[in-house]
Regions:
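Acidic, low-complexity intrinsically disordered regions
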Residues: 1-223
Length: 223
């Protein structure tokens, strides 16, 4: 990601701004926290760990310095397992997980593909988590399918491509939060586990990256 680091940082900060807007818009039904793991062969580090969105400082080049190899499976396995353990006893807690990488897995030591795939499937089907995969310099559809991630997007490996990917991600996330707010009213009276299964079924039926809808919205703005 070193060639597009400026766009990656800017896009992340804009996405956090969108989550803040969602927090305000849906404050009666949602409370948002943000985690960010950066990873390479040198380190796998949580920059933010379940920080309330209104307390997230701006990400800078001091926080994010990509280099060397891509231990994708380790980064996913470590961060997802930790988050699952942290929120397992919190009623109605769920997660929207976006994975962004400019390269294929090539450096993991603790987790294998089958381990991460099983973890994603369990969190998706049993806990109602939402996963999205954004990548470049790879067959994104195949990689996401191998990981059992239903939502994926490829981007062009330059600043414009990275910016466009972040824009679609931010808009998709806001639509997802709107859906979650509507579902909150529809699931009153359900048990916590019933709500998780409801979210899982709804996620399976819904396109997270609805590019047709995105294009229509852009055309409406121009008109």
């Amino acid at each position: 990601m070193s060639s597009i680091v400026r766009a990656a940082i800017s896009g992340f900060n804009e996405t956090v701004g969108g989550i803040r807007a969602a927090q305000e818009k849906f404050k009666d039904t949602q409370e948002h926290f943000v985690s960010l793991m950066v990873f390479c062969d040198c380190e796998k580090r949580l920059v933010y760990d379940k920080v309330p969105v209104d307390k997230i400082p701006e990400l800078t080049s001091k926080d994010y310095r990509p280099c060397c190899c891509t231990p994708l499976y380790d980064a996913m396995g470590i961060s997802l397992s930790a988050l699952r353990n942290d929120i397992k006893d919190k009623n109605d807690a769920t997660a929207v997980v976006t994975i962004i990488t400019d390269g294929l897995e090539n450096a993991s030591k603790e987790y294998r593909l089958k381990d991460v795939k099983a973890l994603v499937e369990d969190l998706t089907n049993s806990e109602g988590w939402t996963f999205a995969y954004i990548g470049t310099n790879q067959d994104v559809d195949k990689v996401s399918e191998d990981l059992s991630i239903r939502n994926s997007m490829a981007f062009v490996d330059n600043e414009d491509g990275m910016s466009a990917a972040w824009n679609l991600e931010s808009n998709s996330r806001m639509r997802h939060f709107e859906m979650m707010s509507a579902d909150f009213c529809a699931t009153q009276g359900m048990s916590s586990q019933e709500r998780k299964l409801f979210r899982s079924r709804k996620n399976a039926e819904t396109k997270y990256y609805d590019e047709d809808n995105e294009n229509q919205n852009n055309n409406d703005k121009k008109a």
